[in-house]
């Protein structure tokens, strides 16, 4: 046995090579260092890689065979396992399977000399975290470690940095005049940062929340100033463009009818129009991630008409008319005296409105069908026969679940606990969609030659601040908008509509006014003010003026098959 050299065996200082590099400092492992297990029968040849990782702050343990790797993983916890595919005895793939049985959460990186595709597919099928081809460079190993262990942190820090850099630009835009299409760009940026910063630094999120609040304040002023001009232009038959955006009553004419072919022609393929009630843009972006697996998605935008409530915006969509014109054309089907936006009868004639719109604006021989789905059992039955929609030229499908979720959260303590804030509410609706009959229906439609159009009638805003309103007993009951006689409200906290016709709205009588809550406010009467303030606080509501309620996507989907 060779005795290790001691100090007495060392050559005198003058005999040592003066230019010899000192050994690199090798930090001692600490409890907070990421731990790596590396299994390779030629691990001695990879010593420079190990030293490089240790110098970068990783604790690396090495073994020379798959069996030892499995034993070490069973005995201890590692943050990453590097596994050579070709080792004597227990091979890499077999070791991978046993490691995953013991520690399914541990990321395993397969390293191999083989470039055969079936080996890659086999390893990927067994849920490896990465696949590297020898020879590997130390920095390649480091990059893999950073991606697996620090990826979320690095991405989060980068998003925060990007937002803080964009903050000044956004603030400058919000401080100046914006056109209707520029407001859409600002809103898209805010929503993207909202999604990307989810779970990040709370101080940065607070900055974003404050900027969101400022944006909604400016947006309300913009709507109050410009909306009557848009209504005038629309009633003068001016098409959406620079002077006005696409509004609710334009959607069928602008985004659906062109897909049905020219007047007198035949549609190239069936069109299925989905209206998902109360769907916000941030929710849509998460739904879209699932749909992009099956469809090419092209997104346009529309502004919901006011009030952003189902009896107005959804009837306008299917009728192709502003509410005041709808009331004149269908006095027995659309009343100007709307008192409760939750009353199903207020939207009982959407199929008749759509048929009338097609007859007026396109042609009478369009074959259409209409369905409204409000329960899970109705949805399951719909998914079972969804391909029947392809037997006609145009199908219109109203999906009420997201709206029901928003209203149910207001009344359910359990739902409030499950979805206590906007990100959780978003996540809850996304989880539903991914596992729903609706997602199944879209997958089936993606297998056929058809075009799908998806939009919403309005969004919803998390309402946290009450504002007092005074009205008589005949005043409508909605929390984000009201209409009645001689309404009184603080003009700094709502939009007051003295002349309903200026907003394209029907007038039920003399001195009839409308008011729309702005930002995150909701209306409460002075009587029992604190009781109802507390009762309705932190509800997702609609009917008023906010970016979340008004700005809505119109998506056209074509199967990728």
Give a label for each model feature.
Residues 3-17, 86, 121, 151-561:
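Feature captures the catalytic ectodomains and active-site-proximal regions of enzymes
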Residues 43-61:
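Two-component/phosphorelay signaling modules centered on CheY-like receiver
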Residues 64-68, 91-94:
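Acidic catalytic/metal-coordinating carboxylates
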Residues 71, 93-104:
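Short amphipathic alpha-helix used as the core "switch/output" element in two-component signaling
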Residues 77-82:
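Active-site beta3 strand of CheY-like receiver
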Residues 94, 115-130:
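Alpha4 helix (beta4-alpha4-beta5 surface) of REC/receiver domains from two-component response regulators
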Residues 118, 136-145:
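C-terminal output helix
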């Amino acid at each position: 046995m060779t005795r290790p050299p001691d100090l007495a065996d060392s050559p005198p200082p003058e005999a040592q090579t003066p230019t010899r590099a000192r050994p690199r400092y090798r930090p001692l492992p600490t409890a907070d260092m990421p731990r790596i297990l590396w299994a390779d029968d030629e691990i001695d040849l990879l010593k420079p890689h190990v030293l490089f990782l240790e110098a970068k702050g990783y604790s690396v343990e090495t073994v020379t065979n798959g069996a030892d790797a499995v034993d070490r993983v069973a005995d201890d916890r590692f943050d990453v396992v590097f596994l050579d595919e070709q080792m004597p005895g227990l091979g890499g793939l077999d070791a991978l399977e046993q490691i995953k049985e013991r520690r399914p959460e541990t990321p395993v990186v397969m390293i191999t000399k083989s470039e055969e595709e079936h080996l890659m597919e086999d390893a990927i099928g067994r849920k490896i975290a990465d696949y590297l081809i020898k020879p590997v460079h130390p920095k390649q190993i480091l990059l893999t470690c950073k991606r697996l262990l620090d990826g979320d942190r690095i991405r989060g820090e980068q998003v925060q940095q990007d937002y803080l850099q964009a903050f000044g630009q956004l603030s400058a835009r919000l401080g100046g005049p914006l056109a209707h299409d520029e407001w859409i760009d600002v809103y898209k940026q805010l929503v993207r940062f909202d999604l990307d910063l989810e779970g990040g630094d709370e101080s940065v999120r607070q900055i974003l929340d404050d900027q969101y609040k400022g944006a909604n304040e400016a947006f309300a002023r913009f709507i109050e100033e410009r909306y009557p001009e848009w209504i005038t232009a629309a009633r003068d038959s001016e098409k959406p463009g620079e002077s006005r955006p696409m509004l609710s009553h334009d959607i069928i004419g602008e985004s659906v009818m062109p897909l049905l072919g020219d007047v007198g022609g035949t549609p190239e393929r069936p069109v299925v129009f989905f209206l998902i009630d109360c769907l916000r843009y941030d929710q849509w972006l998460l739904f879209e991630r699932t749909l992009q697996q099956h469809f090419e998605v092209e997104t346009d935008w529309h502004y919901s008409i006011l009030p952003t409530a189902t009896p107005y915006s959804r009837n306008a969509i299917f009728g192709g008319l502003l509410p005041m014109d709808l009331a004149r054309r269908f006095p027995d089907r659309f009343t100007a005296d709307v008192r409760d936006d939750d009353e199903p009868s207020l939207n009982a004639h959407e199929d008749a409105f759509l048929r009338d719109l097609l007859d007026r604006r396109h042609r009478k021989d369009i074959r259409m069908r209409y369905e409204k789905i409000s329960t899970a059992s109705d949805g399951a039955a719909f998914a079972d026969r969804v391909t029947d929609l392809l037997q006609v030229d145009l199908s219109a499908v109203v999906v009420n679940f997201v709206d029901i979720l928003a209203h149910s959260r207001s009344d359910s303590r359990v739902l409030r606990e499950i979805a206590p804030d906007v990100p959780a509410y978003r996540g809850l609706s996304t989880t539903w969609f991914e596992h729903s009959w609706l997602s199944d229906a879209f997958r089936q439609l993606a297998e056929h030659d058809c075009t799908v159009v998806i939009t919403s009638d309005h969004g919803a805003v998390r309402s946290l601040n009450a504002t007092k309103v005074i009205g008589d007993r005949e005043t409508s009951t909605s929390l984000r908008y009201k209409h009645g006689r001689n309404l009184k409200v603080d003009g700094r906290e709502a939009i007051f509509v003295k002349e309903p016709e200026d907003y394209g709205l029907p007038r039920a009588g003399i001195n009839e006014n409308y008011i729309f809550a702005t930002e995150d406010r909701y209306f409460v009467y002075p009587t029992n003010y604190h009781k109802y303030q507390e009762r309705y606080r932190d509800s997702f509501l609609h009917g008023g003026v906010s970016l979340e309620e008004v700005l809505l996507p119109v998506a056209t989907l074509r199967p990728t098959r």
